[in-house]
Curated annotation (Swiss-Prot):
Residues 23-98, 117-131, 164-168, 202-220, 236-253, 271-275, 293-297, 315-321, 339-341, 359-366, 384-388, 406-410, 428-432, 450-454, 472-476, 494-498, 516-520, 538-542, 560-564, 582-592, 610-614, 647-742 form a propeptide. It comes from Aplysia californica (California sea hare). This is Feeding circuit activating peptides. GO terms for cellular component: extracellular region. One of its GO terms (biological process) is neuropeptide signaling pathway. GO terms for molecular function: hormone activity.
Length: 742
């Protein structure tokens, strides 16, 4: 332990002992002499911390200058702490008391804290930001890692970091919403559950000789510099393990993805002769990437949209026959490919639809078997030559339909279908009608036809389409469905019908609307799950109201002309936020309240402001909250990011920690406040120590003035209050009693 650390520890012990001694020896008040000793300890500790920080900054600046000039930076780097140990942000531990200190975060924290050094004030130092402290290690559902200057991150980005400018850049691809990964130069932290990806390392080539590159020591990893380039700090500088810098074949050219869990995005594989490892740029919720064949016949993935599963196409070089996968939309079902005499489907992960495979060389069985399917599977079937039955596997959620039939059974029956079923039908020999089972949610429709019925019905069923149309010879009406992905219904029109109803349906659209010539109202259909929102308005009704929204809804709003109020409906899961504003704001009143609705899961944050008290308070936030702040921060739950709080006595300063005070003689001074607690295990002595400076009433410059407000419990159970204003603080060596005296 260094002398400075030992001295700091001794001061802290003496300080706490002084507080306990003050508390136990007095009946009602703490003597001024004891509190003056506290002020002396505070002043001495701050001076010691400032001296230590200046020494560390000087070493760091010297090291960077040495590296830039080409001098023995490799040896000097071993003796410098690039990222100093974290300060104990407890009582009297932070010399920069005007800085914001993040609260200690619980499980699933996003990051910790960072602190700037005094080098930021050096004009000629262009890399001042590189002396920042790294963020703490991140756990599951982490947002990002660390870098010396953190990028501005967008929605749900994972991480990224870069360092320096010019030739010293280390940059990660700009990440968008729900993007998967990207990094270079430094390894990513090990991520927990629901991880997006892992980490990989890059090398400079197949062989790495000790004579060509130079390894600059840097912690547990090393910086591999190219001594032949004339500029060691290049953009392509790589981090490698010290033990891998021999003349043998290195392993740093391997890239490995961590084993991914549920809702994983993709994986990759590598071919021997190409040596390429690449993952396609993936969009929102895409499933996997690509693969490459050895015979130059490349298999590429189609550009996939949201929630698409996969797709591919292949060229047969001999026959020129192309096999392409249909263009898949949202929640598309499957795709297939064929190579040679085999028909195989890729093994799909979660959100898989289905698949099947068949082997030509399997003559005896000629079986078609379905892969074991997971959630979001659609259906499947299998059949063998010796088995004249066709059976459907027991299907789970998101099943479409299925049927089975045996030779000795003249009936076709449909399995009981669950949610997201499309339709089904059954028919018996003695029954000339075809009837449709009662269908559940997201069911499409069915049809039936009898011998005496000259009408024809046709289902043009697509992926997850909802219904079709039918037309009879004597019926001059035509009904057509323009069906899209997850569309619910369409429209129809007849010659004698002057009403027209049209649905402009989009992806994940749930409903539409209709309007007739004589009807001046526009109404919205009742919306179900996966609905987005809707609205309706009547000519005589000046209000616009929003329907009650269900799951996966985004938001809605309504507006009242008389009050000019905007209110947000109570939102459910995956809601973003909402706000409302009082109509007095438009009339010039000073109410101007802004309140945030109570938010549920996946909420971002919220705040409200009350004009009379000028207070800003944060709503109680639930899981997946990002952050919030106020002068007294609420207790935050899991997945919170950070927060900070400031003494409630701060009513005058412009920024946290800087305050203005008036002493007993009328002098106005400004300074910095630092809270403390002491005493026994009950912690019943607490208060604020302020270091003040400024110009007094006579115009004289004043510095290092200490003011102390202390509250404590007396021996008889009462509360004692003490206020001391000290103009000149003596040395701690003169005032602090020894351990024997106490």
């Amino acid at each position: 332990m260094t002398f400075a650390a030992s001295f700091r520890a001794l001061l802290c012990v003496l300080f706490c002992a002084a507080l306990v001694h003050c508390k136990t020896r007095t009946k009602r008040y703490v003597p001024h002499s004891e509190l003056w000793r506290i002020l002396a300890v505070v002043d001495e500790l701050q001076r010691e911390q400032a001296a230590e920080q200046r020494q560390e900054d000087a070493l760091a600046l010297a090291l960077r200058s040495d590296i830039a000039g080409g001098g023995g930076g490799g040896q000097l780097a071993d003796n410098v702490r690039w990222f100093p140990e974290t300060y104990d942000y407890g009582a009297l531990a932070d010399r920069d008391v005007d800085k914001r200190v993040f609260d200690s975060l619980g499980g699933y924290e996003v990051h910790g804290f960072k602190k700037r050094g005094s080098l930021d004030a050096i004009p000629q130092d262009t890399d001042a930001s590189s002396d920042k402290r790294a963020l703490d290690s991140l756990g599951g559902f982490q947002v990002h890692g660390w870098k010396r200057a953190l990028d501005t991150l967008g929605g749900f980005q994972v991480h990224g970091w870069k360092r320096g400018s010019g030739a010293e850049k280390r940059q990660v691809d700009r990440l968008g919403g729900f993007q998967v990964h990207g990094w270079k130069k430094r390894a990513l932290d090990s991520l927990g559950g629901f991880q997006v990806h892992g980490w990989k390392k890059r090398g400079t080539g197949g062989q790495m000789h000790a004579s060509s590159p130079r390894v600059v020591p840097w912690g547990s990893r090393s910086l591999l510099a190219d001594t032949q380039s004339g500029h060691r700090w290049k953009r392509d500088t790589e981090l490698v393990e010290n033990r891998q810098t021999t003349g043998q074949q290195t392993e740093v050219n391997k890239r490995a993805l961590d084993s991914l869990g549920g809702f994983q995005v993709h994986g990759w594989k590598r071919s021997g002769e190409a040596g390429k490892r690449q993952v396609d740029s993936l969009g929102g919720f895409q499933v996997h990437g690509w693969k490459r064949a050895d015979d130059q016949g490349k298999r590429a993935l189609d550009s996939l949209g949201g929630f698409q599963v996969h797709g591919w196409k292949r060229f047969d070089n001999s026959a020129g026959e192309k096999r392409a996968l249909d263009s898949l939309g949202g929640f598309q079902v499957h795709g297939w490919k064929r190579a040679g005499d085999k028909k195989s489907l890729d093994s799909l992960g979660s959100f898989q639809v289905h698949g099947w495979k068949r082997f030509d060389n399997d003559i005896s069985g000629q079986k078609r078997s379905l892969d074991s399917l997971g959630s979001f599977q659609v259906h499947g079937w299998k059949r063998s030559d010796q088995d004249n039955k066709r059976a459907l596997d027991s299907l789970g959620g998101f099943q479409v339909h299925g049927w089975k039939r045996a030779d000795d059974d003249g009936k076709r029956s449909l399995d009981s279908l669950g949610s997201f079923q499309v339709h089904g039908w059954k028919r018996a020999d003695e029954d000339d009608k075809k009837s449709l089972d009662s269908l559940g949610s997201f069911q499409v429709h069915g049809w039936k036809r009898g011998d005496e019925d000259d009408k024809r019905s046709l289902d043009s069923l697509g992926s997850f389409q909802v219904h079709g149309w039918k037309r009879a010879d004597e019926d001059d009406k035509r009904s057509l469905d323009s069906l899209g992905s997850f569309q619910v219904h369409g429209w129809k029109r007849s010659d004698e019908d002057d009403k027209r109803s049209l649905d402009s349906l989009g992806s994940f659209q749930v409903h539409g609307w209709k309007r007739s010539d004589e009807d001046d109202k526009r109404s919205l259909d009742s919306l179900g799950s996966f609905q987005v929102h809707g609205w309706k308005r009547a000519d005589e009704d000046d209000k616009r109201s929003l329907d009650s929204l269900g799951s996966f809804q985004v938001h809605g709003w309504k507006r009242n002309s008389p009050g000019l109020k905007r209110a947000l409906d109570s939102l459910g899961g995956f809601q973003v936020h909402g706000w409302k504003r009082n109509n007095e704001y438009y009339s010039g009143a000073e109410n101007e309240k802004r309140a945030l609705d109570s938010l549920g899961g996946f909420q971002v944050h919220g705040w409200k402001r009350d004009q009379p008290g000028e207070k800003r308070s944060l709503d109680s936030l639930g899981s997946f909250q990002v952050h919030g702040w106020k002068r007294n921060l609420n207790n935050l739950g899991s997945f919170q990011v950070h927060g900070w709080k400031k003494n409630s006595a701060d009513e005058m300063g412009d920024k946290p920690g800087v305050e203005s005070y008036q002493d007993n003689s009328g002098k106005i001074l400004s300074g910095k406040a630092q809270e403390f607690e002491g005493g026994d295990e009950t912690g019943d002595i607490h208060g604020v120590v302020r270091t003040l400076s400024g110009v007094d009433a006579s115009g004289k410059e004043r510095e290092n003035i200490k003011e102390l407000d202390a509250k404590f419990k007396t021996n008889d159970g009462g509360v004692g209050v003490e206020h001391i204003f000290v103009d000149n603080v003596k040395s701690a060596d003169d005032d602090v009693p020894s351990a024997g005296q106490m």
